[in-house]
Amino acid sequence: MSYTADSLKAELNARGWRLTPQREKILTIFQNLPEGEHLSAEELHHRLEEEREKISLSTVYRSVKLMSRMGILRELELAEGHKHYELQQASPHHHHHVVCVQCNRTIEFKNDSILKQSLKQCEKEGFQLIDCQLTVTTICPEAIRMGWPSTLPSNWACTRSISLA
């Protein structure tokens, strides 16, 4: 769904929440992001400060969490274990991310076979697919040229796996 201030207000009211000026401003920032750009709560807070908005970091965190739970924002786990957010798309807009663990450069890619295989596995196990995200951790060419280590930082570990065979 593409949210406007009015549709967001209706959605929030239906769930017992209010459309505060802070939430409206946060929605506006996400609506104006170029496609493929994601923001962490800290990056969002920095943008709000640049626009002279007086919104505390804790309010930003609470707002993005709420909007994520409501399906307005999509929560992504990208580089360094930080959560990033993007506006949820109306139609199935499954895409995946390649992330450099050294400089956090992120690119998006689409691969319908990943989604199809995920759906197949979910059906087999009796699960209902809600979202499909793949984050490929890499070292980008620029980081390699700069001589950054080509190993994962010690705080990185593959914590989830599923066999799609």
UniProtKB/Swiss-Prot annotation:
Chief site of localization: cytoplasm
Alphabetical UniProt keywords: Cytoplasm, DNA-binding, Iron, Metal-binding, Repressor, Transcription, Transcription regulation, Zinc
Localization terms from the record: Cytoplasm
Short name of one Pfam family: FUR
Region (DNA-binding) location: 1-91
Residues that bind Zn(2+): 38, 86, 97, 100, 103, 108
InterPro entries the UniProt entry points to: FUR, Fur_C, WH-like_DNA-bd_sf, WH_DNA-bd_sf
Molecular-function GO terms, alphabetical: DNA-binding transcription factor activity; transcription cis-regulatory region binding; zinc ion binding
GO cellular component, one term: cytoplasm
Gene3D superfamilies per the UniProt record, alphabetical: 3.30.1490.190, Winged helix-like DNA-binding domain superfamily/Winged helix DNA-binding domain (1.10.10.10)
UniProt-listed GO biological process terms: negative regulation of DNA-templated transcription; regulation of secondary metabolite biosynthetic process
Disulfide bonds: none
Annotated Fe cation binding sites: 94, 96
Region feature Dimerization, mapped onto this chain: 92-165
Subunit structure: Homodimer.
Function of the protein: Acts as a global negative controlling element, employing Fe(2+) as a cofactor to bind the operator of the repressed genes.
Record-stated family: Belongs to the Fur family.
Protein's name in the database: Ferric uptake regulation protein
Species, as recorded: Synechocystis sp. (strain ATCC 27184 / PCC 6803 / Kazusa)
Gene this chain is encoded by: fur
